[in-house]
């Protein structure tokens, strides 16, 4: 039976069960506007029903949003636009990469030495979005085929509510030219910008072997993090992804066996993996439940986890190429350039939890960096969350894959491994 009924407000009001689920309090960085999110930015954990961690409320809200049709209105507006640039409140956007690239070249938009001017893809939909993950039981329920069809269409439609905008990437290795005295290989760079660069000669020989990655690469990265952040007391690498469009082997993901699979696609959309809520929720569920933890088992009580999280902690993603990157580089945006910009929440609905990632609209002032021809020993680091909220340090960065217009047509696509971690102080 379809759930196209009611309103988001009523869905939320129906949730009366008092839950023992960890519920993060509302949190904002000093000077940061409220997010564009459901429930005024409160986590769906606040709407737990009999231990479901808010998953039913989030799924119902997804159907309400589809029925209200605002997302479809954005698609209709974009698809009815004439070819060429589309005037938006953020600037000129383009439906096609090639159109945006032609505009960049025609207007002589140039980057400094080592940099690159190119199209980057942003959302233009200023509403929260919902993604029902592939492991959710809804997809396998024969009684909910109509619901699954509607959700599948909505998921595809996320990409139809995006445009390409012109941006400039600067060479992150030359960071000191843009920020005198700030080395890209320093914790100070992470504190200020939310991005940095590290060196790693890994002894892992096969990054397609999940067990070897966990056994060899995870400890290497934990050691790297503790050396990079001298004030840190603990580092936990908890999962990883492998990206290789040209991989010919088995790509199958199996979370129960700690196998992430091999991604054929690259996330070509400006986003961040966490936010104010999920940065804390993800940490606590790792410490107390080992939920989707591919790394070292954790055995914290709730009280011990609360004590650990009462001190500073960060979520850091680290991306290491398997070979020199020729195409589909991984690019990073530095914190100060969007510190006063509201993020847009994307809810990822599992059977047992509601994750939150974030998307951003375009600004020409966004401060983008890349590592041209990034080598296999160069590890790009980006902050996904920082528990310090007083504005003294970066809270996060955001990132995307992109297409390098200067690469040869036969350049191989990026092959890399991305690990996710928490660092505690």
Please state what every model-predicted region is.
Residues 1-21:
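PEST-like, low-complexity acidic/proline-rich intrinsically disordered segments
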Residues 6, 44, 65, 77, ...:
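Aromatic-enriched hydrophobic runs in primary sequence
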Residues 356-425:
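Catalytic core of Fe(II)/2-oxoglutarate
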